[in-house]
Amino acid sequence: MLTIALSKGRILDDTLPLLAAAGIVPSENPDKSRKLIIPTSLSDVRLLIVRATDVPTYVEHGAADLGVAGKDVLMEYGGQGLYEPLDLRIANCKLMTAGAIGAPEPKGRLRVATKFVNVAKRYYAEQGRQVDVIKLYGSMELAPLVGLADKIIDVVDTGNTLRANGLEPQELIATISSRLVVNKASMKMQHGRIQSLIDTLRDAVEARHRH
């Protein structure tokens, strides 16, 4: 049995056509189903529906053999028990710093609000900046507006939400897309099956970008 961990939303919607190219079609619509374990058209493949931030945990600990996770999540997670064999080139966006439009660069210690705490610490350590990182789970744009933080680090798609709240994207930390991740033990135990799936998905990604 191969178990693939996916999260609902944009990543799931963009991954399903790639899985379909490998003959893997869920038995019911994951967006509408309340089930968290969904069989597929292949009797030896099932899908796990989990939170996006939990995909690497399920895969690293072997509860899932494979998963699809955004590079932002993988950068924050920093898991060592994962292979990352394929960039699926879906759910593209940017991980950026942002601050109030026209605000001067703060002097001294910087306060940064983000859910990407590890990424923020690494990024500013590489710059030699002293920072206080404030963990938030959502509505990052609010933090600079009410004086909680000088800057935020967040995923940016169009930047419209930032601008609507008087903020502007500033420094690019990373270009983000979704990646296929594989449990290291599963790759050894089921190498032929998983490598075949990786090759099929790679072909599907390349075909999608040829058009």
From Swiss-Prot:
Q: Which InterPro entries match?
A: ATP_PRibTrfase_cat (IPR013820), ATP_PRibTrfase_CS (IPR018198), ATP_PRibTrfase_HisG (IPR001348), ATP_PRibTrfase_HisG_short (IPR024893)
Major site of localization recorded for this protein? cytoplasm
So what does this thing catalyse?
A: 1-(5-phospho-beta-D-ribosyl)-ATP + diphosphate = 5-phospho-alpha-D-ribose 1-diphosphate + ATP
Q: Which residues cross the membrane?
A: none
Q: Recite the UniProt keywords alphabetically.
A: Amino-acid biosynthesis, ATP-binding, Cytoplasm, Glycosyltransferase, Histidine biosynthesis, Nucleotide-binding, Transferase
Q: Name one Pfam family in it.
A: HisG
What is this enzyme's EC?
Answer: 2.4.2.17
Q: What is said about the domains?
A: Lacks the C-terminal regulatory region which is replaced by HisZ.
Can you tell me which family this protein belongs to? Answer: Belongs to the ATP phosphoribosyltransferase family. Short subfamily.
Quaternary structure note: Heteromultimer composed of HisG and HisZ subunits.
Protein name (record): ATP phosphoribosyltransferase
